[in-house]
Structures are given as structure tokens and as C-alpha cells.
Regions:
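Histidine-anchored, small-residue-rich loop motif
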Residues: 71, 85, 106
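ATP/adenylate-binding site constellation spanning eukaryotic-like Ser/Thr protein kinases
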Residues: 71-74, 118
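Residue-level recognition of beta-strand microenvironments
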Residues: 17-19, 63, 80-83
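Charged, amphipathic alpha-helical coiled-coil/dimerization segments
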Residues: 74, 78-79, 85-92
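Small beta-strand-rich domains/subdomains or short beta-sheet motifs embedded
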Residues: 9, 43, 60-61, 66-72
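Acidic, low-complexity mobile loops and tails
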Residues: 1-56, 89, 93-130
Length: 130
């Protein structure tokens, strides 16, 4: 079973979100990285770009496929994980730590955004396994 961290929120499209002081740190879940297989390239978003929740924001390429990453919340890109350019495999080895992809400065209340709790996300993953 893939690891689902209780201190994070999730999107149905398998991104995780850590909210702190109006900043959302985003990566892909352990479930998503397992499904993708070995990550070989991460196309990062551009700094200062604005996105709405659900917008395509980045791309992860694995040995299996290229997968779009979506903005789970609305905001402006304030940081990207440039280390992934040299070490994209961090998305596999540490999806919740060194494998974070980008950070957004929130542009609206998170309560209005359709994020899942860890429990809801775990149930979603379980339902997709069957």
C-alpha cells in the first residue's frame, strides 16, 4: 500500500499539498510515483506564473509515460524544485520530501478548493486499485 501522510491534503489527480502560511508546497503522491515508475525528467512550471486549480502546471516523464501535473489549488508560482532537473528520481525516492515540485502563493481561500483529506485520498487510491 502506498504511503498517505495524514498531515497533507490531496487532489483527486494525485498531487499532495502542504499548506503553511499562505504557501502551498506541491508534489505527487507515493501512489502516483509508484504508478508512473522510474521518473526520468520533470518539466517545472515558470516562476511568477498564475494558475487556477485544475490547470496543467508541470509534466513528469517516466520510463512508462509522460504525465501532466495539475495545480491542486489556485496561486502564483513562488518556487520550483530546481534540484529535480539533475535528480528527477527524487520524485520516486522521496515524493513527500526532496521530490516536491513547486510552491504556490495561494490566491484564494483553501476552504473553497476541492482538496481531499488523507483519509479521503486513501479511500480513492483503494477504489482505483480494484
Amino acid at each position: 500500500m502506498a504511503e498517505v501522510r495524514s498531515n497533507l491534503n490531496y487532489a483527486a489527480s494525485h498531487e499532495w499539498v502542504e499548506l503553511k502560511d499562505g504557501i502551498a508546497t506541491v508534489g505527487i503522491s507515493d501512489y502516483a510515483q509508484e504508478a508512473l515508475g522510474d521518473v526520468v525528467f520533470v518539466e517545472l512550471p515558470e516562476m511568477d506564473q498564475q494558475f487556477q486549480a485544475g490547470d496543467e502546471i508541470a509534466v513528469i516523464e517516466s520510463v512508462k509515460a509522460a504525465s501532466d501535473i495539475y495545480a491542486p489549488v489556485a496561486g502564483i508560482v513562488v518556487a520550483v524544485n530546481e534540484a529535480l532537473e539533475a535528480e528527477p528520481e527524487a520524485v520516486n525516492s522521496a515524493p513527500y520530501e526532496a521530490g516536491w515540485i513547486f510552491k504556490l502563493s495561494l490566491s484564494e481561500s483553501v476552504a473553497e478548493q476541492n482538496l481531499l483529506t488523507a483519509e479521503q485520498y486513501a479511500a480513492l487510491c483503494e477504489s482505483q486499485d480494484h
